Amino acid sequence: MQACVLADRADCGIAHEGDADRALAVDRLRNIVDEDRIVAIEAISMKGTGDLARNTLVTTVMSNLGLRLTMKKHEIEIIQTQVGDRYVLEAMREGGYSLGGEQSGHIIFSQYATTGDGVLTGLQIAARMIQTGRSLAELASEMTVFPQVLINVPDVDKSRVDDAALQELVSQAAAEL
């Protein structure tokens, strides 16, 4: 897709996987615009139009630190869930939120759908480019992606995670970030 964007001098490229419930974009400079950046673009735009319910974005614990910092800069709250679009949707429904997404590509616009929809995501990206008159590269530059390593850690006793002292330490560390 990157080569096609360059060869065709396109403003962007948008790709979908098998069942098209996810989207990935490439800007005109051939940079991949991942789901964290896409959801950042959407949250900022929706806040500007008054469409970001309760001024809040729902995402998972796997989101990049850059997304959290960008949302903080734009005074947008973040609700984090465990990994999985079903948890994102559950939190959106419980809180009455309009936008949620996860790093794997599922982005949910509750105004239009109750599941991740890659075609809808692609249309939203195009709409933001048209509405703002900015390229995808310019829109994506709102967020800096920080290096990130995701490691699956087996956990036999999940009750240890609920320990109040541990939760306090996690909250303190998150506040420092």
Locate the predicted segments by residue.
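N-terminal small/polar loop signature for handling phosphorylated ligands or for N-terminal nucleophile
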Residues: M1-V26
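Generic hydrophobic alpha-helical segments
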Residues: M1-V5, A43, V88, A173
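Short, well-ordered alpha-helical scaffold segments within catalytic/effector domains
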Residues: Q2, A40, L166-V170
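Phosphate-binding and adjacent anionic-ligand microenvironments
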Residues: C12, T49-L177
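Short glycine/threonine-rich catalytic loop with a Thr-x-Gly-x-Asp
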Residues: H16-G18, I32-R37, A113-G116
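Anionic group-transfer/hydrolysis microenvironments
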Residues: E17-D19, L29, M62, S104
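Short Gly/Thr/Asp-enriched flexible loops that form oxyanion-binding sites at enzyme active sites
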Residues: D21-I41, L67-R68
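Short, acidic/small-residue loops that bind anionic groups at enzyme active sites
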Residues: N31-A53, Q82-G84
